[in-house]
Amino acid sequence: DMAVNIAAGDIGLFNDNAKYHIDRIASLRTVLARINTKGVLGDPKVRAAFISMTDRKAYNEVILKGTFIPGKAPVPPSLDYGFDQLTDPNAYNVDRAKQLLDEAGWKDTDGDGIRDKDGKPLSVDFVIYNSRAELPIYAEAVQADGKKVGIDVKIKPVDYNLIDKMGIN
């Protein structure tokens, strides 16, 4: 018998069990979030802050059970193009994220914990599909990290087939 593509959250069921032999190989598969470059995320400082506020290392360790390598370039670590020598300008750094948002003019003027500018709250939709069990959990982690810097992250589950259409529009 054989199983492939075991969900990250389920791999622990098979570890340390003499009944199972697990072979792991590096994959070209990625877990990514596409960032809209319109609206509030049209500002490069807000985009950089959004990326800097996300603790991708913790997401991998806790949600994905250490089965992925956090990205820092559009090149997967399984390709030998010097991935280990690359730097990550948007590594997890809450203070940097807050500073970038300050520089972009987003402040919490009403004390509700969410930054605002010109009377509008800093709110971002995080669109996910539910066919992969880890995505809602991942989105909730991003939402919690958003609160740390004053971004209201709204989770919007949609059918998988709508994701690409949303990117086109």
Residue ranges and their predicted role:
Residues 1-38, 61-62:
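Extracellular/periplasmic solute-recognition and catalytic clefts
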Residues 1, 50, 101, 126:
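Conserved hydrophobic/aromatic pocket- or pore-lining residues that grip, position, or stack substrates
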Residues 19, 39-40, 46, 51-68, ...:
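Sec-exported extracytoplasmic/periplasmic mature domains
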Residues 70-109, 130-137:
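Structural transition elements
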Residues 27-49, 53, 62, 74, ...:
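A bilobed periplasmic-binding-protein/Venus flytrap-type ligand-binding module shared by bacterial periplasmic
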Residues 4-10, 56, 75, 160:
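Beta->alpha turn/N-cap motifs
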Residues 10-11, 46-47, 59, 97, ...:
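Short, hydrophobic alpha-helical packing/hinge segments within bilobed ligand-binding/sensory domains
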Residues 107-169:
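Ligand/substrate-recognition segments at binding pockets and active sites
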